[in-house]
């Protein structure tokens, strides 16, 4: 007979596998600093400190080797999804509404972050899309504070060029 494992043990193994193998693949972060850096992301997200969070992301992406970034917008979306999922936040990518598809929705106990990404566009265009397509509408009756965030990535610098928040 095979030993039985609790679901939480398996989840912990999966999480450790993500940290050990995927995060270093997508970034230059090593195994020692990964948990510490991820804790900083968590604190900033939980406190609604989106500027510190995006500044940390800029530094994070700047330290990522350019060879692994192929399809840039998808790369950034994947990295954000992995980080948010690892730390236990409710996160959805390509969230469908009646008017379109939100690139990323992140929910904490106090905040909802609606993020739209552009590659070689503008953060203003990304935010305008959130407003034009009424992406916040499904969340308006929720009691949590809502942040609409337009983000532009630069293919040249392979990083976040600008973000704006409403």
Show which residues each predicted segment covers:
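Acidic-basic catalytic patches of nuclease active cores, encompassing PD-(D/E)XK
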Residues: 59-92
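Leucine-rich, amphipathic alpha-helical/linker segments
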Residues: 11-66
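Active-site metal-binding core of divalent-cation-utilizing nuclease and nuclease-like domains
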Residues: 83-109
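Domain-level recognition of nuclease-like catalytic cores that cleave nucleotide substrates
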Residues: 138, 142-166
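Short, small-residue-biased leader/transition segments that mark boundaries at the very start
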Residues: 1-7
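Conserved catalytic cores of phosphodiester-cleaving nucleases, focusing on short active-site segments
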Residues: 80, 102-119, 133
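Nucleic acid-processing catalytic cores of prokaryotic defense/repair systems
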Residues: 82, 86-88, 127, 131, ...
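Mg2+/Mn2+-dependent nuclease catalytic core
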Residues: 119-136
């Amino acid at each position: 007979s095979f030993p039985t494992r609790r679901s939480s043990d398996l989840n912990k193994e999966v999480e450790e596998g993500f940290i050990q193998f995927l995060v270093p693949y997508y970034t230059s972060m090593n195994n020692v600093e990964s948990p510490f850096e991820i804790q900083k992301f968590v604190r900033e997200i939980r406190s609604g400190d989106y500027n510190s969070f995006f500044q940390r992301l800029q530094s994070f992406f700047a330290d990522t080797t350019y060879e692994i970034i192929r399809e840039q917008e998808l790369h950034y979306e994947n990295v954000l999804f992995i980080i948010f999922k690892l730390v236990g936040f409710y996160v959805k990518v390509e969230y469908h509404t009646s008017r379109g598809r939100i690139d990323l929705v992140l929910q904490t106990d106090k905040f909802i972050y609606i993020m739209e990404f552009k590659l070689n566009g503008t953060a203003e265009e990304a935010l305008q899309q959130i407003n034009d397509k009424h992406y916040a509408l499904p969340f308006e009756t929720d009691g949590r504070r809502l942040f609409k965030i337009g983000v532009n990535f630069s293919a040249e610098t392979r990083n976040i060029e600008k973000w704006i928040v409403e």
